[in-house]
């Protein structure tokens, strides 16, 4: 089941049980919070604003890194890996899912799928 991001006040986005505080660049969850580096924040904000929508790597690179994007998709994979680790540490019920040759999306994960 996928839910679009819900805006909470002017500085919060919410998907599943995770909130993104856009003022402090922090992921907030019932278990705690994780501060995000600049690129991590930009990528997570893009995912949360487009929850459930597959986005090709090229779009992620253009929107987060802009015209100065490094060649190759490895940099996107690395930052997605950082975000996945932080989401896991928080016990989030959302995951960044990969679809071969189609891109990545942020999805709400049912409890049975998390185990």
Language model feature labels by segment:
Residues 1-15, 114-115:
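Basic, amphipathic DNA-recognition helix from helix-turn-helix-like DNA-binding domains
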Residues 9, 32, 95:
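Glycine-rich, flexible loop/turn motifs
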Residues 16, 52, 66, 101-103:
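Glycine-centered flexibility sites
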Residues 1-4, 53, 57, 80, ...:
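Short, cationic motifs built from Arg/Lys/His that form the positively charged side of catalytic pockets
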Residues 73-115:
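Flexible loop/N-cap segments at domain edges
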Residues 14-41, 105-115:
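A structural micro-motif at secondary-structure boundaries
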Residues 26, 31-36, 42-79, 88-90:
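Positively charged, aromatic-enriched patches within helix-turn-helix-type DNA-binding elements
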Residues 12-14, 19, 35, 54, ...:
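Short aromatic/basic micro-patch
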